[in-house]
Curated annotation (Swiss-Prot):
Binding site for S-adenosyl-L-methionine: G187, E188, S219, S241, L242, H243, N320
Chain residues that bind [4Fe-4S] cluster: C133, C137, C140
Reaction catalysis annotation: adenosine(2503) in 23S rRNA + 2 reduced [2Fe-2S]-[ferredoxin] + 2 S-adenosyl-L-methionine = 2-methyladenosine(2503) in 23S rRNA + 5'-deoxyadenosine + L-methionine + 2 oxidized [2Fe-2S]-[ferredoxin] + S-adenosyl-L-homocysteine; adenosine(37) in tRNA + 2 reduced [2Fe-2S]-[ferredoxin] + 2 S-adenosyl-L-methionine = 2-methyladenosine(37) in tRNA + 5'-deoxyadenosine + L-methionine + 2 oxidized [2Fe-2S]-[ferredoxin] + S-adenosyl-L-homocysteine
Active site: E113, C363
Stated family: Belongs to the radical SAM superfamily. RlmN family.
Other facts noted in the record for this chain: Reaction proceeds by a ping-pong mechanism involving intermediate methylation of a conserved cysteine residue.
EC number of the protein: 2.1.1.192
Domain Radical SAM core: 119-358
UniProt gene name: rlmN
Stated name of the protein: Dual-specificity RNA methyltransferase RlmN
Length: 392
């Protein structure tokens, strides 16, 4: 068998090494409703039992079959023998002055990061899809950690379950329940579709977390073939990590652009929009503002021209620094000038408020604890380049 020749191909080829069963028991968090119903049918039970169990798991965040009082004792005993509800554990919690909470979540012998962001009218959970990331975007902390593996369904939906359980226990303190989930944490979701899609199905299932498809957002840096596949698998809100209006700049800061350039990426986005109701006809464009790299007035005009055939809402993101990064954050005046140009073209343009940067929980700062399998960190050491080491 030929070996993957790029980091992204390597990531796509790696399946989770976490076993499906622990101690001979299947983790029910790995199953969407269709799979859960088949599980109960195989046990000789009626498929509606799946709906009952899912409701206990996701509506009430129960992980003990004995608490499921509308299930008879015989079935509860059978479930204890063959199944479990095992979400990843929190290794550490950090709280920001602005109310943001970041959790280091243990997955096997490594850690990913999950962030809860409360606002006046919503509470968003930022969820990771991989241990590390293979795409090597230069302005992103996660990319500097290298890549190890894809997360399983249970490790993705388990982040939501764990956060919902914690937030539920904090209701007396006024914490808003999770209303939105964004797949914008560690990793490239489109390189882990086989696990990300079932997890998003559970997020939107009435017997799961019951979120509207407009409140579940997947963000991608531009894996175009997988984006086409996504459109045939599920309908969720789409955000794209564009970050540059021209290929010469994007080739440097988002290296996957060398394989799928801006024109190809946006064509894929338009194909997705024709299949999607969740997006209401337009995509959210994420654009990190890097001082004197991608933030000139000329580049604002270029971005507007670039997006003229792709209905878009644009989020301008002040860059969030991390140790060893070669960039600076654009000044407020440069960001304001950039936004003004885009609005003059008629684009809805928002300058995203930085949240959680005092605990390294802001956009682009998530790092976790990753055992790199791409040799990226080894190459940096050999070249004498700085390596960001995070202790969580």
């Amino acid at each position: 068998m030929s070996q993957p020749n790029t980091a992204a191909q390597f990531a796509a080829s790696v399946v989770s090494e976490t076993p499906e069963k622990k101690g001979g028991k299947i983790n029910l968090l790995d199953l969407n409703r269709k799979q859960m119903r088949q599980f109960f049918i195989d046990m000789g039970e009626k498929p509606f039992r799946a709906d009952q169990v899912m409701k206990w798991i996701y509506h009430y965040c129960y992980d003990d079959f004995e608490q499921m009082t509308d299930i008879n004792k015989i079935l509860r005993a059978k479930l204890q023998q063959v199944a479990e509800i095992r979400a990843p554990e929190v290794a550490e919690e950090q709280r920001s002055a602005d109310g943001t909470i970041k959790w280091a979540i243990t997955v096997g012998d490594q850690q990913v990061e999950t962030v809860y962001i409360p606002e006046d009218d919503r509470a968003t959970l930022c969820v990771s899809s991989q241990v590390g990331c293979a795409l090597e975007c230069k302005f992103c902390s996660t990319a500097q950690q290298g890549f190890n593996r894809n997360l399983r369904v249970s490790e993705i939906i388990g982040q939501v379950w764990r956060a919902a359980k914690i937030i539920g226990s904090l209701k007396s303190s006024g914490r808003r329940p999770i209303t939105n989930v964004v797949m914008m944490g560690m990793g490239e979701p489109l390189l882990n579709l086989n696990n990300v899609v079932p997890a998003m199905e559970i997020m939107m299932d009435d017997f799961g977390f019951g979120l509207s498809k407009r409140r579940v957002t997947l963000s991608t840096s531009g894996v175009v073939p997988a984006l086409d596949k996504l459109g045939d698998m599920i309908d969720v809100a789409l955000a794209i990590s564009l970050h540059a209006p021209t290929d010469d700049v994007r080739d440097d800061i988002v290296p996957i652009n060398r394989k799928y350039n801006i024109e190809q990426f946006l064509a894929g986005v338009r194909r997705y929009l024709t299949k999607s109701n969740a997006n209401q006809g337009r995509v959210t464009v994420e654009y990190v503002m890097l001082d004197h790299i991608n933030d000139s007035v000329e580049q604002a005009h270029q971005l507007a021209e670039c997006l003229k055939e792709t209905p878009s809402k644009i989020n301008l993101i002040p860059w969030n620094p991390f140790p060893g990064a070669p960039y600076g954050r654009s000044s407020n005046s440069r960001i304001d000038r950039f936004a003004k140009v885009l609005m003059e073209y008629g684009f809805t343009t928002i300058v995203r408020k930085t949240r959680g940067d005092d605990i390294d929980a802001a956009c682009g700062q998530l790092a976790g604890d990753v055992i790199d399998r791409t040799k990226r960190t080894l190459k940096k050491r050999q070249a004498g380049e700085p390596i960001q080491i995070r202790s969580v």
